[in-house]
């Protein structure tokens, strides 16, 4: 009986932790000071966050505005900030900006491209979202020049 109760307690804790992680990603990764940096990857030098996690561009976005909401934002969480984004080493501060999302939050942009994470990238250096065709368009990493890198 003890083993069954322990199993149920562990299963419930694991399920709750999973919901919290998904909910955090679905709302975007919000930071007071949001830093964008660069890192070397198998695709070349790319944009990453302060922890080295890859940032992506969604080809569907037009005019610097995000078109990724709902299920899209659950898989591709936007990089959200509460203030002006900070340029890390190798990032052009003049290319950093923000765009207001439908919920009023500020999403970080680079060279006019709203920036997103991919939920499958959990460690620095992972680029599993590169060249993925989801939600009507392709997803690409960006170079420090703010250009899409079309290698996969």
Regions found by a protein language model. Name each.
Residues 2-10, 18-152:
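Compact beta-sheet-dominated domain cores in extracellular/mature segments
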């Amino acid at each position: 009986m003890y083993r069954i109760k322990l199993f149920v307690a562990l299963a419930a804790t694991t399920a709750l932790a999973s919901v919290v992680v998904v909910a955090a990603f679905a709302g975007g990764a919000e930071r007071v000071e949001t830093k964008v940096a660069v890192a070397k990857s198998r695709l070349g030098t790319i944009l990453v966050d302060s922890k080295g996690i890859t940032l992506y561009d969604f080809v569907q976005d037009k005019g610097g505005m995000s078109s990724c909401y709902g299920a899209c934002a659950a898989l591709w969480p936007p990089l959200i900030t509460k203030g002006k984004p900070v340029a890390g080493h190798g990032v052009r501060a003049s290319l950093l900006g923000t765009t207001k999302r439908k919920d009023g939050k500020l999403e970080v942009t680079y060279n006019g491209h709203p920036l997103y994470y991919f939920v499958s990238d959990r460690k620095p250096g992972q680029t599993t979202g590169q060249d993925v065709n989801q939600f009507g368009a392709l997803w690409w990493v960006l170079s420090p020049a703010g250009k899409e890198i079309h290698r996969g």
